[in-house]
């Protein structure tokens, strides 16, 4: 077959140009993906006692449009180590908590939505102790004595004159199911304020540390808004009150009236990616002089969100106990969320 001189080089150039056009079209297509609205990171304090209480995670104040669904799946893995005591109390938390939660929201009517959350919990010795010890050693950080105890062992214990509890055997099952009703009562071009009423049912086994064994109720006020400047920032916050029910496992120890609050900032640095920083805090779950159960908790979270497809996003985040011992040493979290584009 006869080929004109220079034809091969021309064909290669045409093929290269075609490939470049395809790549450019693919990248442009990614940039054109419709993305959904901003949302705080899903954060729960999974400390063995605080995790039993029905404290709600932050969510945006925007309400799901009438007739629409928002669906999310959240996964968390928390590692605990606290060993503390005084003349009248002794506390030991050593283990890991795994939690997977299905979250469903449904738009009941204009400015009203209903949210259902169904969690599955696992309490065990886990597998992260060695990794965390190596991390502390690498950075020369204090480990609070965790390297001197056996690794990957489950041992939750508390004892005082007022009561005691313990868990040494691995457990896993459904946790406490929660239901909440939210109403947006203020809205303008850049912000929304909503109120929520929530109820946590004592469906988890309290003796296995899968729930409190009691019903809790809360009220929350939430806001969401865009930064009033050219910066691509969104802000979210919540403040609320929870009334805890009578828990058999915490009998004689628990605090019944708990406040909670949180603030999140979402920086959308590209159309399909954002970085989120978040603070969450709540009142101590027990009447105790020991920080691990009697101190007000402060958690800090840093995460990233990828809007990988129309109406879909995935979050990856790490939670640290800013106030040491009031939350797990570290919690690794991931969420996948579907939210209709009309959801804001």
Predicted feature descriptions by range:
Residues 1-47, 342-344:
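Cleavable N-terminal export/targeting peptides
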Residues 37-245, 254-343:
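Transmembrane beta-barrel domains of Gram-negative outer membranes and organellar outer membranes
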Residues 251:
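Short helix/strand-bridging catalytic loops that position acidic/His residues to coordinate divalent metals
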């Amino acid at each position: 077959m006869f080929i004109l001189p220079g034809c091969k080089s021309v064909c290669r150039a045409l093929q290269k140009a075609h490939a470049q056009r395809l790549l450019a079209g693919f990248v442009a297509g990614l940039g054109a993906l419709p993305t959904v609205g901003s949302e705080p990171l899903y954060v729960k304090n999974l400390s063995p006692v605080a995790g039993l209480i029905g404290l709600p995670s932050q969510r945006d104040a925007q309400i799901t449009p009438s007739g629409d669904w928002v669906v999310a799946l959240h996964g968390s893995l928390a590692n605990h180590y606290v060993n503390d005591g005084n003349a009248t109390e002794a506390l030991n938390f050593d283990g890991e908590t795994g939690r997977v939660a299905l979250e469903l929201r449904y738009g009941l009517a204009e400015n009203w939505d209903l949210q259902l959350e169904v969690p599955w919990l696992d309490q065990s010795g886990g597998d992260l102790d060695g990794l965390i010890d190596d991390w502390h050693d690498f950075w020369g950080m204090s480990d609070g004595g965790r390297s001197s105890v056996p690794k990957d062992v489950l041992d939750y214990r508390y004892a005082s004159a007022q009561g005691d509890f313990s868990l040494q055997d691995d457990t896993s099952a459904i946790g406490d199911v929660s239901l909440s009703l939210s109403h947006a009562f203020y809205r303008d071009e850049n912000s929304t304020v909503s109120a929520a009423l929530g109820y946590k049912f004592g469906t988890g086994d309290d003796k296995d540390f899968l729930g409190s064994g009691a019903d809790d109720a809360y009220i929350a006020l939430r806001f969401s808004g865009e930064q009033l400047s050219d910066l691509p920032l969104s802000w979210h916050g919540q403040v609320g009150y929870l009334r805890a029910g009578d828990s058999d496992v915490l009998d004689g120890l628990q605090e019944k009236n708990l406040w909670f609050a949180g603030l999140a900032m979402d920086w959308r640095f590209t159309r399909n990616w954002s970085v989120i920083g978040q603070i969450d805090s709540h009142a101590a779950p027990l009447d105790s002089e020991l920080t691990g159960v009697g101190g007000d908790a402060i958690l800090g979270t840093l995460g990233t969100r990828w809007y990988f497809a129309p109406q879909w996003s995935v979050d990856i985040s790490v939670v640290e106990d800013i106030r040491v011992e009031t939350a797990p040493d570290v919690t690794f979290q991931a969420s996948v969320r579907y939210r209709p584009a009309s959801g804001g």
